[in-house]
A protein has these predicted regions:
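Activation of the activation-loop gatekeeper triad in protein kinase-fold domains
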Residues: 226-231
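Helical subdomain adjoining the active site within ATP-dependent kinase catalytic cores
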Residues: 282, 286, 300-341
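ATP-binding pocket architecture of kinase catalytic cores
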Residues: 31-187, 195-204, 217-219
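All-alpha amphipathic helical-bundle segments outside canonical DNA-binding/catalytic cores
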Residues: 157-158, 283-294
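Active-site activation/catalytic loop segments of kinase-like enzymes and analogous catalytic loops
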Residues: 238-280, 294-312
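Catalytic-loop of the protein kinase fold
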Residues: 204-206, 211
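Juxta-kinase regulatory segment immediately upstream of eukaryotic protein kinase catalytic domains
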Residues: 1-25
Length: 341
């Protein structure tokens, strides 16, 4: 590995693999930059002076069981390529961890802006901000309308008992990353487990749907939905609830989470939910349970990132404040369920 290579990506070995499996794709010496802003899988923009691609691989060090599955990401963007959901072109999947030290996949580079802050949106004006937020919701509706079997994803997950399995999965991953006491986390889990709603029609779900996981083109349309590592078949309201949870960042004082939803012109939570419900035709009457579950899930994800940070296994800046937000997520998740009574 050359000293100029980014952490976790040997460019010489990557080039050799691409030459062997996609002859003619690469024309010159590869360079790479780590994409900042991600908190889980590592993302690199790789170029040869003529073309650019994106490479994704799992994080360095401690990796949670069932998480960071490159095969799932590659499979879902391959399946969605010819649907109304905009995704990059899937180019190559490598399941041989010996090539660069972990599984990875290569996809096309898509032009677009990942808006992350209210200041970025404020520069566009209220009208454009509203248009982008509406496009975000509409793209989610489009995703949930895709027939999984028609795009080769009929066996992508097991929607029966999805919510119960999700609770077990995230509790297991919490236990795998537990390195400190987290007051209220057991109460939140138990409250959720005692009141699991009956799911409606299942769909392909993204698992981490939010504004800074999409690219927006110059016409304020979504040019690509990214970061599919938690996608599966399941209850689509989990996607909507996570979008709502991210929009309520101010209630939990998470300064490291995108504050884009506070930009002038961005629709309120009620407006987002109403637009989704009207366009999808889905029943959102029990959304509070899903939002509480979203806070539980976020708490587990961030605790895993905090654990890797304390072990020195994160790449890039901005991880030092992640752990402080976990108790706030737990507290707000419990408050939402108590409001239901």
């Amino acid at each position: 590995m050359n000293p100029t290579d980014p952490p976790g990506l040997d460019l010489d070995r990557l080039r050799a693999h691409l030459d062997a499996h996609r002859p003619g794709l690469v024309a010159g010496e590869l360079t790479a930059d780590v994409v900042e802003g991600g908190r889980s899988n590592l993302t690199y923009v790789v170029g040869d002076g003529r073309s650019r691609w994106v490479v994704r691989r799992p994080p360095l060090g401690h990796v949670l069981p069932t998480a960071h599955d490159m095969t799932r990401e590659f499979r879902v963007i391959s399946g969605l390529r010819d649907t109304a959901v905009p995704v990059p072109e899937a180019i190559l999947l490598c399941e041989d961890a010996d090539v660069v030290g972990a599984q990875f996949y290569v996809m096309s580079f898509v032009e677009g802006t990942p808006y992350r802050t209210a200041d970025e949106l404020a520069q566009l004006g209220e009208g454009r901000t509203r248009a982008i937020a509406d496009a975000l919701v509409d793209t989610l509706v489009d995703l949930h309308a895709v027939d999984p079997a028609a795009v080769g994803l009929g066996g992508f997950g097991r929607p029966e008992g999805f919510l119960e399995r999700q609770l077990r999965r995230w509790k297991k991953q919490l236990d795998a990353s537990r390195s400190r006491d987290l007051d209220g986390i057991e109460e939140l889990h138990d409250r959720l487990a005692a009141a699991v709603p009956v799911s409606g029609k299942p769909s392909i779900i993204h698992g981490d749907y939010r504004l800074d996981n999409v690219l927006v083109d110059s016409g304020d349309e979504i040019s690509a939905v990214l970061d599919w590592e938690m996608s599966t078949l399941g209850d689509p309201l989990t996607d909507l609830a996570l979008l709502v949870a991210y929009a309520e960042r101010d209630k939990v004082s998470l300064q490291f989470v995108s504050n884009a939803s506070s930009a002038p012109g961005y629709p309120t939570t009620d407006e987002v939910v109403r637009r989704y419900a009207e366009r999808s035709g889905r029943d959102v009457s029990q959304l509070n349970w899903y939002v509480s579950f979203a806070f539980f899930k976020l708490a587990v994800i961030l605790e895993g990132i905090h654990y890797r940070y304390t072990q020195g296994k994160t790449v890039g800046a901005g991880f030092e404040g992640v752990g402080a937000g976990v108790p706030l997520l737990i507290s707000h998740g419990n408050e939402i369920l108590k409001e239901e009574k």
